[in-house]
Amino acid sequence: MGPSPQTPQSTQSTHPIDDAGAGAPPERPLRIVAVLFPHVTQLDFTGPAQVFSRMPHTELHVAWHRIEPVPTDGGFSILPTTTFDDAPQADVLFIPGGRGAFELLEDATVLAFLRRQAATAEHLASVCTGSFLLAAAGLLEGRRATSHWGSLHLLERLGVTPTAERVVRDGPAITAAGISAGIDFALRLAAELHGEDAAKRIQLQLEYDPDPPFDAGAPSRSDADDELAHAQIAAMTELRGEVVDRAAARLHAG
């Protein structure tokens, strides 16, 4: 056997955008704690992480049960930087989505971690189906939130008001719709934390200027074959509904 890998360190911004006139930096970096899990949709995580990497005085901690490679839906793995036991308290709690998120709705350790982090976090953030984890932990009850359009309606079963918008802010919660909306959410958060000018500079550095070949990225505008698109996710949505129902029963029983 070869030597054991070193424990990775949290990721700090390596090329941050400075805030003009922001004054003295805080005593410690802003802490963003992200939850990683098997079969995470990689762009849900990596898109916002790219924005976070350019925010000034910011640390990104990536948590999972163990420090070991975690497979994504993209065919590659990501190595967490910390465990649920060792993660620091977050200023921003961030949950990406993916099919693996629904498996975590029944993971008591993960839900307890989210509640513990939420007790002190100023921002509760999610992308895509990551909002279901926040909801299952009781952190979105009575609030507006969004998710991927294919699962959005299921949020209501967890006491959430489903809202079909790209980014939804309600109190401490800021949720993004499906997958690519994560970049929009992260830029909005950057603007809230560091000012609009700083967020615009990050957007320019990333050359985030979407110009898709088709206007088919939202159900309200798409001229794609809606029946086929819905049929392809119908079976998955039915299974997800069963998991959400069990999570709702536990939430309401508590």
Task: Please state what every model-predicted region is.
Residues 131, 174-190:
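Active-site-proximal catalytic alpha-helix in oxidoreductases
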Residues 140-169:
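A conserved active-site-flanking secondary-structure segment within enzyme catalytic domains
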Residues 146, 150, 181-184, 197:
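Generic recognition of short, well-ordered alpha-helical interface segments
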Residues 105-108, 146, 177:
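Residues at secondary-structure transition points
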Residues 119, 169-174:
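Short pre-catalytic strand/loop immediately N-terminal to key active-site residues, enriched for Gly-Thr
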